A protein has these predicted regions:
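Gly/Ser/Thr-rich phosphate-binding loop
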Residues: 3-72, 85, 93
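Glycine-centered tight turns that cap/initiate beta-strands
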Residues: 17, 83, 123, 181-184
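Hydrophobic, well-ordered secondary-structure elements that form the walls
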Residues: 21, 52, 104, 148, ...
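Active-site glycine-centered loops adjacent to acidic/histidine catalytic or metal-binding residues
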Residues: 25, 52, 78, 140, ...
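Short, P/G- and charge-enriched loop/turn segments at secondary-structure junctions
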Residues: 69-76, 127-128
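Conserved ATP/PPi-binding loop(s) of AMP-dependent carboxylate-activating enzymes
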Residues: 79-83, 94-128, 167
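Residue-level recognition of short loop/turn positions
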Residues: 85, 90-94, 101, 146-147, ...
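AMP-binding/adenylate-forming catalytic core of the ANL superfamily
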Residues: 110, 115-116, 126, 134, ...
């Protein structure tokens, strides 16, 4: 939202004490990432764009501050943290080729993992562990590029069905905010009666 207001507002503040920038919650658009890095971080602060869920108990994908030898890519959450084995798979659980959209899964249990849902162990196993054998199903779309970097593409269940096509809400939101007259957008489906 700051980006659409121009550079004057952030440039009117002394941001020299910043050492690290963070973003979490939704995939970050590469253009926004570049602006954030240049204008807010003054091209000196790494951006820690993390992926995690409450159920994972902590960050699963994140650039690690202090490891500047791993270059950042605008819009990518980078790589799994050490010890986390992530894959991007198709609907049958087969790993997809690089640069192909698929489901983000975690192959093995890890410290901090949610062990059950309060009062509903069956739902926990059904929602998170039954779609792919012995793998945690995140419910998110992602792709892995040729360098192994992960690009989060939004929720798999956050999809609109329009004229026989499945379109992700995050894709529409990115398209809408590409218009200079739009600061923010949120897309949600409504039933077609």
């Amino acid at each position: 939202m700051f980006m659409k207001s121009g550079d004057d507002i952030p440039n009117s503040f002394d941001l020299s004490s910043l050492r690290l920038l963070g973003t979490v919650g939704e995939p970050i658009n590469p253009e926004v990432w570049k602006w954030y890095y240049k204008i807010i971080g003054k091209e000196k602060c790494p951006i820690v764009d993390t992926w995690w869920q409450t159920e994972t108990g902590g960050m699963m994908i994140s650039p690690l501050p202090g490891l500047e030898t791993i270059p950042l890519k605008p819009g990518s959450a980078t790589l799994p943290v050490p010890g986390i084995d992530i894959a991007v798979v198709d609907e049958f659980g087969v790993e997809v080729p690089s640069n192909t959209k698929g489901y983000l899964i975690i192959k093995n249990p890890w410290p901090g993992i949610l062990l059950t849902l309060w009062g509903d162990d069956k739902k926990y196993k059904t929602v998170y562990w039954s779609k792919y054998t012995n793998c945690y199903y995140s419910g998110d779309y992602a792709l892995r590029d040729n360098d192994g970097y992960l690009w989060l593409l939004g929720r798999a269940d956050d999809v609109l069905k329009i004229a026989g096509h499945r379109i992700g809400t995050a894709e529409l939101e990115s398209c809408i905010v590409s218009d200079d007259n739009v600061a923010e957008s949120a897309v949600c489906g409504i039933p077609d009666e």
